[in-house]
């Protein structure tokens, strides 16, 4: 059994993986939006996740060969459910981006930081550490301030994005349940990506005429979203969630809004308002208290256990 110190190191490493996911997703937000100028949302989802599947599949094969314990028979079925939640979240987010701003989408997507602990209580009857609630509220406030402290008038795209946040929260919760039980984070990633690729391409073939010129024009965005945002980003999420709770993971993943703003300043010459910098500080503070307070308030008998 790992020592208390080893558990702390593992959890810190897990949260670093989740921060990396947030950074990669934040950088990919603009790509997701600009791709819609050339290609439909369904084909974009299908193609990006086809690339992500190609990234994850060799890792899943390596993982299978190295595994010491057999995988529960129900794991593939559970992974398929995660894939459906991921597809629903990706689809509603992309459809929302057709009619809402990147700012609104970034903030409303961040609602999952509140939805995750809510779903955990409703469906799993698990109460997260009390600090998760104020930390989630702080993270949401920080995202709001980062968006300039205001939202443009809500439209249909905004409501789709709120639905997206519910599906993201469901995906985070399901990953938190099943990645530990299966011990196969790479296979989980491969299966959920495959579900999104198949459903996206199938729906695209039915509802969106495929234009190879449009695909060529959107290729840089598709490649980034496929390899980095989907492939690397979601793999880091799944690996990180093996060693932390879903509500805590949601707080660290919400850093995508922070990284989107900071990378916009560094790479695109965008500006952050003074209120936005306060938002950055609030998000960072939320992550710190979510990491530190549960450890400081842990009963001594647990903290001292080997």
Which positions does each model-derived feature cover?
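C-terminal-most transmembrane helix of multi-pass membrane proteins
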Residues: 2-4, 9, 48-49, 57, ...
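Helix-helix packing/entry segments at the starts of transmembrane helices
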Residues: 45-47, 105-112, 175-197, 230-266
